[in-house]
A protein has these predicted regions:
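Conserved short loop/turn motifs at secondary-structure junctions
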Residues: 114-120, 147-154, 186, 232-235
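Alpha-helix capping and helix-loop boundary segments enriched in small/acidic/polar residues
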Residues: 29-36, 86-90, 98-102, 153-157, ...
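A glycine-rich, hydrophobic/aromatic-adjacent loop/helix-cap motif
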Residues: 130-223, 311, 431-432
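Generic, well-ordered alpha-helical scaffold segments in large soluble proteins
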Residues: 1-4, 43, 47, 102, ...
Length: 558
């Protein structure tokens, strides 16, 4: 690790605790301005290829040419983001050499130009490139890359394409000490149901393509008749805005059809009239009565149980499967989500929802996990052989759990998967045995050929938004993040007395020079606001290629 001489490069607009620790141990801080990640990443890549430091052997064996990246798509409409982003001319390349040619042709990726826009010392870009790829005594360094939300949520497609290409250039991917991935540890693990039919989506884009339904835009356009909101504040989250709150107000509270009776049939008739009149009916399912989605706009409240109040499985970002056991009864009428959904489904006339407990749900979902990155079906197979439930068997792995996909060896023991896309992994030569299922992603990448797609990452797709958003006049960049002191929105923490006593409010960190200029001192109460907040109106149709660009939306009055 870092304390044993590992070189660490941190790219972050702020000197966080992690940055300070890395610097203390000889690391490098790329102190970029917000949103300029793509420029700096591609500038690093440019230095690497200009000097011939790329991992040529890895690239030769594991990178697609154009035929490889196009294969498997057939001749139909490119109607999913994966398809059209892979084969779109702005992104697709003919292979590494074509990507290199494109990279070197972009003036904005010259180190001096990228450094100027990003507000960073050009020497840091040069050092980063050397650390990541320059051979020492004829031996290439092993480089791994880790990203998180600030990186891929700010310029999602562009930043992801750029960092993927850089990873390919340095040979990071699928080998011990040479991997690339995100750092998130979200507790997830649900099995997906049927996909939304994208060809039915109203979100039309140029050509014959359609985007997945954007529920914010659909609601803003007044088309949402019923919203079943589960576990999200919605109006305050992501693209939430006062504009969205006003629309909720219009469609619910301001609609003339309001419940004024305790009679069940009268309530049903009233809500149907509201929906038929162009209004919206809202169901809110959450562990708290959230303001305003729950206590102001919801017509029906489903109080939900949370972790500790029901036994269930989870899988985190590294596919680590674990059981979280119940240790406390849920308050009042609160029920686990699976129970609420099952009762709704049965009342709607659907079969197959007769679960007795959360283990029943887990066992039914096990077979649908086969071949996935969290495949846990063989845990269930082992459990049934031993006369146990799936939860009981998984519980034997304790706090550490087991990483999916999970396989059963010939002696009946279970084996997890340390890393996906492991190009060094040796599988059974004669194929999977018993109920085991092999997935291409175990030893290859998720393309038709099993190789990586190296893509372009044009700055022009983001630069119009960035140039509009960057501070003007006396404005400052403002970032929001997650701190352990007051986690996220305070959804849970603000209800904990010992947290609130120590941190009664969220805090703002500001550079001393900026604070002095504005007369701000430690302990002051501040209001952080912006006079310039872009928000999409009711547009769901795109005709020209530029219609969904930021500049195109602004020109159209959105």
């Amino acid at each position: 690790g870092i304390q044993n001489g590992q070189k660490c490069i941190m790219m972050n607009p702020r000197r966080t605790a992690g940055v300070a620790y890395a610097e203390k141990n000889g690391g490098l801080w790329l102190d970029i301005d917000l949103g300029t990640d793509l420029l700096v990443v591609n500038a690093i890549a440019r230095i690497i290829v200009e000097n011939g430091w790329q991992d040529a052997e890895w690239i030769k064996n594991w990178v697609n040419n154009k035929w490889g990246s196009s294969s498997g798509f057939g001749q139909g409409t490119r109607n999913t983001p994966w398809q059209w982003r892979t084969t779109w001319g702005k992104f697709q390349t003919k292979g590494f050499d074509d990507w290199k040619k494109w990279l070197l042709s972009q003036d904005e990726f010259k180190p001096e130009n990228a450094a100027k826009v990003a507000g960073i010392d050009i020497k840091k870009i040069q050092t980063a490139a050397e650390w990541m790829a320059k051979p020492v005594k004829g031996k290439r360094p092993k480089t791994s890359i880790m990203i998180e939300k600030g990186f891929y949520w700010s310029n999602n497609t562009g930043n992801t394409q750029a960092i993927s290409a850089l990873a390919i250039a340095v040979g990071a991917g699928g080998r011990p000490g040479q991997v690339v991935g995100r750092a998130g540890g979200h507790q997830r693990g649900g099995q997906r149901g049927g996909k939304y039919p994208r060809n039915k989506s109203p979100m039309k884009v140029p050509g014959r393509r359609r985007r997945a339904l954007d529920t914010d835009t659909w609601t803003m356009s007044g088309h949402t008749r019923m919203a079943h909101v589960i576990g999200t504040t919605w109006i305050q989250s992501m693209c939430g805005s006062q504009q969205l709150a006003e629309r909720f107000e219009q469609l619910t509270v301001a609609n003339p059809h309001q419940i004024r009776s305790y009679d069940k049939q009268d309530i049903i008739d009233t809500l149907k009239k509201r929906a038929d009149s162009g209004g919206m009916v809202v169901i809110n399912q959450d562990i708290y009565l959230v303001d305003p989605i729950g206590n102001r706009y919801a017509d029906i409240i489903f109080p939900a149980a949370t972790w500790g109040e029901e036994t269930f499985m989870r899988a985190n970002g590294e596919r680590r499967l674990r059981v979280y056991n119940k240790f406390y009864d849920a308050p009042g009428e609160a029920k686990p989500d699976w129970w609420i959904i099952a009762e709704l489904a049965k009342r709607m006339g659907f079969d197959g929802f007769d679960w007795k407990n959360s283990n029943d749900v887990a066992e039914e979902s096990a077979r649908f996990s086969r071949g996935s990155r969290k495949d846990f079906n063989m845990i269930k197979v082992a459990a049934k052989r031993e006369g146990k439930t799936l939860h009981q068997k998984l519980g034997e792995f304790g706090t550490n759990g087991i990483q999916g996909p999970v396989f059963m060896k010939e002696d009946g023991t279970l084996e997890g998967t340390k890393r996906l896309h492991d190009t060094t992994r040796k599988l059974w030569e004669d194929g999977p045995k018993g109920g085991n299922v092999y997935n291409k992603k175990l030893t290859h990448f998720n393309s038709q050929t099993g190789r990586c797609n190296i893509q372009k990452s044009p700055w022009s797709l983001f630069s119009d938004y960035w140039n509009w958003m960057k501070p003007k006049g006396n404005e400052l960049w403002c970032t929001s993040g997650r701190t352990n002191e007051r986690w996220q929105s305070g959804f849970d923490d603000r209800r904990r007395p010992y947290i609130v006593q120590r941190w009664p409010d969220n805090y703002v960190e500001i550079h001393p020079d900026d604070a002095k200029e504005r007369g701000i001192e430690n302990g002051d109460m501040l209001m952080v606001y912006s006079d310039r907040v872009p928000s999409l109106k009711e547009t769901i149709l795109g005709i020209e290629g530029s219609d969904y660009s930021f500049a195109g939306q602004m020109k159209a009055g959105n």
